[in-house]
Amino acid sequence: MATLILSFLLLLLATKLPESLAGHCTTTTATKSFEKCISLPTQQASIAWTYHPHNATLDLCFFGTFISPSGWVGWGINPDSPAQMTGSRVLIAFPDPNSGQLILLPYVLDSSVKLQKGPLLSRPLDLVRLSSSSASLYGGKMATIRNGASVQIYASVKLSSNNTKIHHVWNRGLYVQGYSPTIHPTTSTDLSSFSTFDVTSGFATVNQNSGSRALKVTHGVVNAISWGFLLPAGAVTARYLRQMQSIGPTWFYIHAAIQLTGFLLGTIGFSIGIVLGHNSPGVTYGLHRSLGIATFTAAALQTLALLFRPKTTNKFRRYWKSYHHFVGYACVVMGVVNVFQGFEVLREGRSYAKLGYCLCLSTLVGVCVAMEVNSWVVFCRKAKEEKMKRDGLTGVDRCSGSHS
């Protein structure tokens, strides 16, 4: 039952649609209205536009958010290659270091920018198709730049004849040094901020990495159930059910079934993690990855150890039990810690999914405490009974000795 509850609560996370579907877009701003809009797959961004086919001109507005009061938000197009930052011509909005007012400057992202050979300097765009641009904060003149503040970047783009597709990029950063925006964060989401859309149909072709969100959620749900709940539950059954003489050796089969199910599900989750790492070159979550490898290795050793389990009469049995307990508990601790690391990687540190997992884990811990207290009560009661029996036998022996 607890596993079903955990699965349901974690599926609250799994049912969260990607931002491209869950986000909202608008065709109306304070100064202008547009015909079409789409939500972009990352950073809760969106874009609205009106296409004028008679002169192949595109009027658009990009909606983004600041992640720092001293940060920047940018949008641009790549006239040559889709899914590429290098070669893009971008417009970046940030607070003027002198006046603090929002300004919008043009930049060309050549290969030196990616290599970070020097600061990014503003220069006129060598793209005659970008005819006008401006930026404003949501809220008008009284609005201030702050963490989470919305910005609107307006632009007019002249498209080539017979071409209604536009390759565009967008991103945001934490700091601006003078008039030089610094590098944006390098999470998988930030590295996936590009797509191609058709201005006539509104159909967007997003990058392949945008689908990784669903894969990450699947990875998280499977691992939370396996490493984060089933393995601890299996350890609990081994510790407390075997003390119940009424069920005999049944406790062992229950323990083995739970642990084997957890390991098989964990193997699936671990494999998904490998796929995610392969699909995200340059993105590494060091601690999460190291804990995952260590947990899977420990679980594999536990499974293999069953093949070499000595009989109860074997003199090496006690050494095997010590090894089995140590590796097992280490695997459980690392697995639970890594589940919480996974919530941070998914940026779900304050989500209902994490709350649900914490409730299920707390319930399991509560059961452990109750069973542990019960075990000590039973142990103390038996010890007292044994002592009374010994004292009684001693008294009888003394009486027998005195009469003789």
UniProtKB/Swiss-Prot annotation:
Any one Gene Ontology cellular component term annotated for this protein: membrane
Listed Pfam families: Cytochrom_B561, DUF568
Membrane-topology descriptor: Multi-pass membrane protein
Domain DOMON, first and last residues per copy: 43-173
Cytochrome b561 domain residues: 180-380
Signal peptide positions (record): 1-22
Co-factor: note: Binds 2 heme b groups non-covalently.
Iron keyword on record: yes
Function summary: May act as a catecholamine-responsive trans-membrane electron transporter.
Protein name (database record): Cytochrome b561 and DOMON domain-containing protein At2g04850
Lineage, opening ranks: Eukaryota, Viridiplantae, Streptophyta, Embryophyta, Tracheophyta
